[in-house]
């Protein structure tokens, strides 16, 4: 159900600086940093903090530009994703590559020349045959996923020395893959596509990475995905002007509802995701992004935006 009186949102800041379209934003999980990326090929990092507003006793959030990273990508930077530690930033680009950036510790920077950047590129991942649309770190930092216009999803294993190795290439979609998102507590990956579907993948002990479920309910391109913080729900936003909320069901719940999972993996047999609620009638244009608020909300609709 939808709240009777939706909360009013107040604009905190208007961040300007990119010369062209801004495509994606990502909050650093450990530091007070916000990353943005753009068609201008740059990545901008903003710090933020709360300041007392004086006599009223309230506070305001102030943003400040910390660094502009010339990404080195040859085309649009489409997506940014932080590692769980907040020390590595991944970028995906229409030039078909993924860039990897790491923070230079203060003790090392002190020995470098003035003006040296706080972040430097330490690697580039290649493999996609066309535009790389999205990139996402797993909750524990063990894996990085990327997807592209070539209909593929790549999974990269992250080794302790920050060396990235391809762990799987999955071509389950029939069209352009728009986004990839990891489950917040398990190594489950979701992807969404121009083919109107959502795919779920797991590292099966017998078959490596496999697609174990296909979610179908949207009537057009699925642009965005977001797992709830508790991991029980998945929200999907689409070109069909609606948002679906999917509920994760175990094998017993699937049997009770008469749901038969489309695919099976040896360690997820019988599990399924059920389309439990559809938000529609509130949008007049395609929905390009959806995200959950922090916290384990008992009612999924109350924490979604």
Q: Model-predicted segments: where are they?
A:
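Loop/turn segments within WD40 beta-propeller blades
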Residues: 26-31, 80-86, 136-142, 181-187, ...
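Conserved strand-to-loop turn within each blade of WD40 beta-propeller repeats
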Residues: 37-40, 91-95, 146-150, 191-195, ...
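WD40-repeat beta-propellers
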Residues: 43-48, 98-103, 135, 153-158, ...
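Surface-exposed loop/turn positions within WD40 beta-propeller blades
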Residues: 31, 40-42, 95-97, 150-152, ...
